[in-house]
């Protein structure tokens, strides 16, 4: 597993956007052979989305032959709800690039049969040949997507009850009122993520430092679902200085030495 320790959130956003754009361009997608990209929501990826939009506007990347699958969605929120992940993605990314509407896939938290919705999502990913690159963030408790602590590391797309810590973290999007935060969500599973050809996880801020430590220095542990990346042949964590604060000095220096050519660009 790689870890790229950058200076700040701005560098993390710029580097990750260029990385995603490079992967798309190297793949040279067509309508018959699209690049399948997994996407997150939340505060961490916003800078990446801003930079991807700039790259698109500059003609450096096109999303015309990209198919996306979002990681998760709240149960019970309509697509036009201000805090739905549908709304987040269109407001912050999709409305600003050239991706066709039919190429966008987001779980429907208002589906009449939620289990069928999850099964259909998995089936569509499989039909398209799997996800090439899954881009995501990590929670302060180490969760990826809504795979909360103690999630099965072989889990698939399913309904998930959110932990108190996640509800508190997300209350900032609901007028700081934890009672407004939905208690259930639909989420891709850890197994779904691990099936991707490549996983790119971003971690920024002091509140992500314990999660980064668990992912890099800890053992594979279902209480820190991000630690499953240790088992992936192409797992990459990109973080800022604040998110490395719990790492041992020798661990941080090791990755700084490994990634010296990349770090020298910034």
UniProtKB/Swiss-Prot annotation:
InterPro entries: Glc/Gal-6P_isomerase (IPR006148), Glucosamine6P_isomerase (IPR004547), Glucosamine6P_isomerase_CS (IPR018321), NagB/RpiA_transferase-like (IPR037171). Its EC number is 3.5.99.6. GO terms for biological process: carbohydrate metabolic process; glucosamine catabolic process; N-acetylglucosamine catabolic process; N-acetylneuraminate catabolic process. The keyword Cell inner membrane does not apply. The record marks 151, 158, 160-161, 254 as: Part of the allosteric site. Homohexamer. HAMAP family: GlcN6P_deamin. This is Glucosamine-6-phosphate deaminase. The gene is nagB.
